[in-house]
Every structure is written in C-alpha cells, then in structure tokens.
Amino acid sequence: MATSAPELTDRLTWPGRPEALRMADLRGAPALLLFGCASSAWTRQRLDDMSRLLRRHGDKLQAAALIAPRFDAERDPRNLQQLQAEHALPFPLALDADWVAWQQFGIESWPTLLLLDAQGRERKRIVGAGPMAELAELVQALVAETPEVPARKKPAANGKRGLMPELPLSYPTALVVGTGKLYLADTGHHRILECDFNGRIVRQFGSGAYDYMDGGAGDAAFRRPQGLALQREALFVADTGNHALRRIDLLSGDVTTLCGNGEGPTQIGTATIDQPCGLQASASHLYVAMAGDNRICAYDLSRGALETVAGSGFFAINDGNGMFAAFAQPTGLALRQDVLYVCDAAGSAIRAVYLRDQRVQTLVGQGPYDFGNIDGPRSIARLQWPRAIALDPHDPLLWIADAGNDRLCTLRLGGGVVSGFSLPQRLHSPGGVACGNDALWIADTGAHALLRLDGRDGTLRHVPVGE
C-alpha cells in the first residue's frame, strides 16, 4: 500500500529560490524526487533522465532533487549552481548538507529516485542509474493513471543564480594545446573553442544548444563536453552528456560521431560508452576514461571498435590486470609511451595503466571514501576529487587539478611525493590542465576562467577568452 511521503525538512538549502519547496508543491501531478550527490556520475545520469522525461510529459510531470555532499567541498551551495547550469535542469535543487532528508526518507545510497503519485504517495523507489527505458515505462504508467487536473504552476528551477552564467566562459574543463592554438571545452556553454594563446576566439564548434547533432561548426551540438584529444587535423571530443565520442575535422570544421547515440549509455562491442570524460590519443587508438562505467576503454581509430582496456565496472580502487582492476569514476588521462595515467576522481586517486599487459597500479589514494588535503610520500598523501592531470614535458612530473581542495599539485613519478603548488590566487574547483607553449594552462572551472602559468618565470595570468 502506498504511503504519503514525509514533509521536506526545513534544514534544506534552496539556492536562488525565494522560498523552500514543500511537498504540497509536488502534488497535483506525478513527481520525481531524486536523492543524489553532485560528484556522482550516476546521479548526473539520473538528472538527465529526469529532464528528458519532463520534456516528454510537459505539465503532467514534475521533479525536484535533494543533493547531499559526498566530499567536504560539496557542502558549498555553489555546486548546485554548477550542476544546474551544466545539465540545463528545469527543476529545483536543494542542498541537504547534513543528510537530514536522506535519513528522513530512509535513503541508503545514491542515486535513489522516488516516484510519487499526484497525491504525494510513494509508488516506486529506484536505486542506481538503471536503463532509461525502464524508468520511462514506470513514469508513463503513473502519468496515464492520473486524471486530468487544471493547469498548475510547476516548481521552477533555482532562479537566475541557478541558470547558466552570462559570462564568456561557463564551467570550462578540458584543454589541449596545438601548434599556435589552444582548444577548450566550454562545458557549461556546450561548445568547443579554438583560441590563440592570448584568448582570442578563432572558431567555435557547436551552436551552444544543449543537444546532440552532427554537422558544420555552427550547426553541431554537444552536451557537457569534458574531454579533448588532438591528433594532427582531428580534434576528438568526449561528449559526456550525450554518451558519445565525437570528431571535429579541423580543416572543414565538421563534427561527426564516432560512437554513441546521444540517448544514454550504449553497449558497443565489448564495451559500454557511459559518460566519457578524459581522452588521450595515440597513433592508432583513442583512450577514454569512462566515468559512468568505471572503466578505461580504447577506441580503435582504424577499425572503429570500442574495447575495454581495464576495469571491472565496480566502483572501487583495486589494482590488478585488465578486468580484475577497478576504478572509481575516472575523469582524466595522460599518456607517455606505454603508460596511461588515470585521474580517478571519485576515488581521490591517481592510477597508472601499463598498456603492454593492462596492469593497473595505484600511485596515490587509499580508497573511494578516503580523501583529504595532505602532501608527502604517496603512502600518506591525500587528494579530494581530482578532476584532471597533465604530464610535464620537461620533468617526470604529473600536474594534478585537485578540484575538491581548490588547488594545483604535482606528483613526482618514479616513487616521488605529492606537493601542493603555491599560486598567487586561489583556484575554484579546477577541472582541466594542459602543458604546451612553455606554459601550464589551467581551467579554473568554478571561476569560469582560463589561467596561464608561465613555465619560465612562474607568473600566473588570466587569459581573457572571448572578452
């Protein structure tokens, strides 16, 4: 027998809303109520699923999400602003900083989605990010059994502070440096930029629409692109929100899809394309950090085949060979000869994959729930939600965008230490780093900015992209 959902606690924070959402606001039509974490790839998949269902059913369906902090850094309500902008969410989000609502509703893991009927009664509880088709069928049945009601105002998104910032850049992430050019994933604006080293925009790839479309530079569309790799006249894009790998022909500007369909996670051969993030290109393969599937994959550029390199798919930090290893939401990659370095974001870890035998070794990190801000030998060093890495071209160093600690740090390869790198200004959840043209380029994601750290004199300057 369906029971009424409890009232929402007053201890929730609703950024940008004049007043808190109440359960009464979700009555009158079926509703989706999500419990998740902003850093969780599976939560983000459910948010996209909810948006698709709201567009499909219009006024006959409504939604809200209660977001709890997995990491200390996620206690900042501004994380919800980023979440709403990157996903173009049309419904309100609340921060459950002390997990009060989670306890109130008996939530045990993220994401958990409650399906409520028009009377506010819980009809179904779905744990995890399962197939969209299954969720769509359940929602369709719930909508079909609901009698027509007079038009009513649905709970709106979190207001202007929850919308895409009106700035030249919006939550930039991935970077790659070419000959005389810098390529940048302007993630919140759903586009890729080609710039000169002074920040002048030379070309834009993608219309900026939150969509999925191949075509010319101005017609193509992306959803939250978060990975880039350059190979001669081709720029590869990890189109995260579309679960797709895309290719930009730098001669014509045309955008095509290598694999994925823009709808959701898709099985392709022996691998699943599920929220691809980090990319690295070799002469023959495109390596992919598959954040939603906790695996490292390789796309054969000649055969057009996607294969798993390492990872069982389980959310964990386990070393081993190939499928016996486990990752925790990998988001960034760096490649040197036959070693692929992996930024394992949710595991707060840095890993190495030795491509000759697919052996995985943890360089920094102790487990998915062991994080902090500690420099020193690898055995004691701690990171918090690192999002990107880059290899120094001159020294055996790995640069790390330690997003959860708002800092830049280095790992000296070959058994060295983790060291925080002092900068004259604070970073804001940096989500991208790249080396090139005698500089380290930093995507200061939360500040909507691109920074350049000069490799010769150590000066840091703001790069005025599009300004």
Identify the residue ranges that each predicted region occupies.
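N-terminal "domain-start" segment that seeds a small globular fold
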Residues: M1-A24
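Short active-site neighborhood of thiol/selenol oxidoreductases, capturing the structured segment around
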Residues: R22-R44
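Structural microenvironment flanking redox-active thiols in thiol-disulfide oxidoreductases
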Residues: S39, R44-E86
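Short, internal strand/loop/helix patches
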Residues: Q81-S109
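A short, hydrophobic beta-strand/beta-hairpin element that forms part of a small beta-sheet core
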Residues: V100, P111-I126
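Thiol-/selenol-based redox modules, centered on thioredoxin-like
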Residues: R123-T173
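Gly/Pro-rich loop segments of beta-rich domains
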Residues: R152-T173, G199-R224, D254-C277, A305-Q329, ...
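Conserved beta-strand positions in repeat-built beta-propeller and related beta-rich domains
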Residues: L184-G188, V237-G241, V288-G292, V342-A346, ...
